[in-house]
């Protein structure tokens, strides 16, 4: 029998992805090369600005300013940090996006901004490359999705795991303060 056929059909060679680390690195390199995760103003607007002598916004400075504003308000209100679920708030804090309409209605992606500590983004597995461009996310962890659609009868266990992860962040970076701001869950 022909080795390129299986029965009457041609043989489809299986995809061999290699290691998870290699796939993640390839995703990061591709995202950086294509600059596909930075939403911009577009070529027409950039040309108009150049024609009018208007400089493009300094995105790294803007990201730093936004994070400083968040932390100043958290400090003023004596919070250890903020837990963000709203995709607009996550975008403001981290300048990263991932399936905005979906996560607007399903608690699957979130972010913790410590008042005096790291910005930890909880995202879908292997989506680290979606926030690499921003330079303000200190760590990306896999999100623990505790909604029934994802966890079914394991929801109680997932909620406890999620809560323990948030409590650990607050204990590690809250300086003894256990109060956090939450936009919504």
Regions found by a protein language model. Name each.
Residues 1-185:
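A composition/biophysics-driven feature that prefers long, compositionally simple stretches
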């Amino acid at each position: 029998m022909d080795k390129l056929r299986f029965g009457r059909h041609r043989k489809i060679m299986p995809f061999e992805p290699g290691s998870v680390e290699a796939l993640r690195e390839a995703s990061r390199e591709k995202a950086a090369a294509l600059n596909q995760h930075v939403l911009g103003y577009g070529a027409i607007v950039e040309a108009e600005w150049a024609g009018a002598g208007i400089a493009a916004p300094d995105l790294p400075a803007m990201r730093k300013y936004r994070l400083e504003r968040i932390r100043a308000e958290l400090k003023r209100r004596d919070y250890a940090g903020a837990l963000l679920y709203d995709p607009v708030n996550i975008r403001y804090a981290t300048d990263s996006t991932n399936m905005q309409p979906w996560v607007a209605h399903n608690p699957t992606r979130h972010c913790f901004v410590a008042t005096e500590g790291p910005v930890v983004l909880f995202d879908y597995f292997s989506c680290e490359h979606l926030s690499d461009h921003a330079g303000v996310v200190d760590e990306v962890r896999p999100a623990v999705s505790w909604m029934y659609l994802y966890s079914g009868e394991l929801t109680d266990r997932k909620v406890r795991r999620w809560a323990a992860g948030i409590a650990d962040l607050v204990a590690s970076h809250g300086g003894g303060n256990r109060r956090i701001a939450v936009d919504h869950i």
